[in-house]
Amino acid sequence: RGLGDVYKRQGGIKSHQRNDDHVPGAEKTGAQSEIIEQEIKEMTNFDYYAPTKVVFGKGTEDQAGDLVREQRATKVLVHYGSGSVKRSGLLDRIYQSLEQAGIPFVSLGGVVPNPRLSLVYQGIELCKKEHVDFILAVGGGSVIDSGKAIGYGVANEGDVWDFYERKRVAAGCLPIGVVLTIAAAGSETV
């Protein structure tokens, strides 16, 4: 199972279909109209508050260690995807910044698009074993989403997949920082 499948299961496809229904000339079937009406009835009111500090600019990755230290992290999981962060030297700069700030870390790479649950489970176990209290995701949306899933899995008992299937509500999550490598991810602010 991939975490990208969660989007499809939890309304992404329905939301997309709902948007298509507003296209002039698009015809809705009776079944589509009933589904949309039922979804509207089931909507829940909510407040959304998600403060996010964004540090932007050339060379800001060199501040990673200091920024993580501001969050009072005592041990960090550096979570990343493909070899591009290694080849570019970015991962080494992150490691150096953490070392200069005196913050111990462990690493877990190998995130692929639509992250695999097996890697999330591996990350959860690594974080628990190493007493990690902060996750630093270095990459794009899939790395960030995988890091979030690991954060929820560490902070809550049971199977992290239950949260994605809405069987349980998460009580917390490890703090997560991001060194974003792609401008279009969007995952970094939620």
Q: Where are each of the predicted segments found?
A:
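A glycine/threonine-rich phosphate-anchoring loop and its flanking beta-alpha core
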Residues: 155-190
